């Protein structure tokens, strides 16, 4: 039986990094507490996850399913590393891509009401090996709902890669197959993670400030 890959665990008392140490867009300078995961660390970790995916799923055609919008940066970078491995190693796998868009957040809370509001026809997943790529697992309810939806199309295999998993008492206990970082129960933005559609244009994963939440509240 396949085992889930390990992750980098960021402790509850992790201080993060001062904003002044990084290039932060000026329009967000007053809206963030700190840089939590620098972009370079994200990229290095993503490269390793690509190797883990190849080891676990290599040899079979993969349909990579991107969960929009927050997952698009991680999705693009992960697939770039997989493509590099395809070019430079003896083991390669053909890949195709699909997209699905879900909505479960209002302000900084996961509503638990999961809506599929866009995406391709998922009948293309039938009989395929599917890699779902997500930005963050919070309560886990969204992913459980998506997995139930995907299973209706009878894929051959389903694996989930998430850049982040949040430690939270609200969790239903779901854990993805591939995890970049396990983080404390803080609301993070950047690297395509948003707060009411803002902050997707940050390179780093950052902790939003209370003033930032108030400024961009829906």
UniProtKB/Swiss-Prot annotation:
Residue(s) carrying Phosphothreonine: 142
GO molecular function: guanine phosphoribosyltransferase activity; hypoxanthine phosphoribosyltransferase activity; identical protein binding; magnesium ion binding; nucleotide binding
Cofactor: binding comment: Binds 2 magnesium ions per subunit. The magnesium ions are essentially bound to the substrate and have few direct interactions with the protein.
UniProtKB keywords: Acetylation, Cytoplasm, Glycosyltransferase, Isopeptide bond, Magnesium, Metal-binding, Nucleotide-binding, Phosphoprotein, Purine salvage, Transferase, Ubl conjugation
Residues in cross-link Glycyl lysine isopeptide (Lys-Gly) (interchain with G-Cter in SUMO1): 115
InterPro entries referenced in this protein's UniProt entry, alphabetically: HGPRT, Hxn_phspho_trans, PRibTrfase_dom, PRTase-like
Keyword set includes Acetylation: yes
Location in chain, cross-link Glycyl lysine isopeptide (Lys-Gly) (interchain with G-Cter in SUMO2): 115
Pfam families the record matches: Pribosyltran
Function: Converts guanine to guanosine monophosphate, and hypoxanthine to inosine monophosphate. Transfers the 5-phosphoribosyl group from 5-phosphoribosylpyrophosphate onto the purine. Plays a central role in the generation of purine nucleotides through the purine salvage pathway.
Record-given protein name: Hypoxanthine-guanine phosphoribosyltransferase
């Amino acid at each position: 039986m396949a085992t889930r890959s390990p992750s980098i665990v960021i402790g509850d008392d992790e201080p993060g990094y001062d904003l002044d140490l990084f290039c932060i867009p000026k329009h967000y300078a007053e809206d963030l507490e700190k840089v939590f995961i620098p972009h370079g660390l994200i990229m290095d970790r993503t490269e390793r996850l690509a190797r883990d995916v190849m080891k676990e799923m290599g040899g079979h055609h993969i349909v990579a399913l991107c969960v929009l919008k927050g997952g698009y940066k991680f999705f693009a970078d992960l697939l770039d590393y997989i493509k590099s491995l395809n070019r430079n190693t003896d083991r390669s796998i053909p890949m195709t891509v699909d997209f699905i868009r879900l909505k479960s957040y209002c302000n900084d809370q996961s509503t638990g009401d999961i809506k599929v509001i866009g995406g391709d026809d998922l009948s293309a997943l039938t009989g395929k090996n599917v890699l779902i790529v997500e930005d963050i697992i919070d309560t886990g309810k969204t992913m459980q709902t998506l997995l139930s939806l995907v299973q209706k199309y009878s894929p051959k295999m389903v694996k989930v890669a998430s850049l982040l998993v949040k430690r939270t008492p609200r969790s239903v206990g779901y854990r993805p197959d591939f995890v970049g970082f396990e983080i404390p129960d803080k609301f993070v933005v950047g690297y395509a993670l948003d707060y009411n559609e803002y902050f997707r244009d940050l390179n780093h994963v950052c902790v939003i400030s209370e003033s930032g939440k108030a400024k961009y509240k829906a």
